[in-house]
Amino acid sequence: MKKVLILICGFYLFLYILGFIIPQKITHPVLERLSKPVTIAHQGGNKIYPDESLLAFTNAINMGIQVIEFDIHRTTDGIIVINHDHTIDRLTNGTGLIREMSWVELQQVDGAYNWSPDGLTYPYRDKGIKILSLIEMMDAFPQQLYDIEIKQHDPPLEKDLCDLLRKYGVAADQAIVASFRDETLARFHDICPEVATALPVNQGTILYILSRVGLERLLPLDAVVAQLPTTFSTKLGQLELDRRYINAFAKGNRQVWVWTVNDSIEMKRLMNMGVHGIITDRPDILMDLIHHSKEYAN
């Protein structure tokens, strides 16, 4: 009798452990809109047109890019704006931290004053290019998929972002939110659980370790997408993105996107490795590769 009980207990323990190890597929509305390979225009394609400008986003969308990636901050008067850097110094003819400026002040600068395709010419100076607000983005491209990176963390803007996405009805199936700060992503997910989020940095490191021994299912994940470079720095040192890591994350119906890839040979290598999406400054190169590839062309 004792042996039978031990066997029964052992059997249920086995099932319990198995339940953690066997991946359970996630479902999310945003995943249903993505087709492999997922094409993502980094800052709209900032090697073609000025970073995160209406010109860049329009060009990428007209090419057929699935997702446009951009970064957000908030002004002193509460407007969420699109800009890569914390300051406006690099690209505009102004200076200052965005979080210390008003929307009116931002609209007074030339958004592409210092942008150059070759380091010698400045073709978009005095062309009326302005820093965009998130509202302007959603008004211009109401059906587009957005990959939104929260850059500002102090003061936090997660609630304002969630409120705005909900107001415009894009929360459930149009937005993926990312951040290099794990605490920022955690706060946003708590406030806005219906919106897809990217893999936090620390979880990415743990997942890498577990994937080496086939125990990736032991790590509970809320993320639907991992956005990674091919080589990433961790407390363990430099780690290389490989097929094992991609497969470990993808088992739960999740996706791996790689940034920032501007070379067609590298794009093809990564797609052949199993990467789901390519984040690029050159959407023209990526779309040309897909259109001329029998494997990826529709």
Task: Give each language-model segment a name.
Residues T39-A41, I68-F70, Y146-I148, A175-A178, ...:
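Hydrophobic faces of well-ordered beta-strands that scaffold small-molecule active sites
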Residues A56-R74, A140, L219-A226:
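Catalytic domains of carbohydrate-active enzymes, especially glycoside hydrolases
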Residues I22-V38, L54:
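N-terminal signal-anchor transmembrane helix
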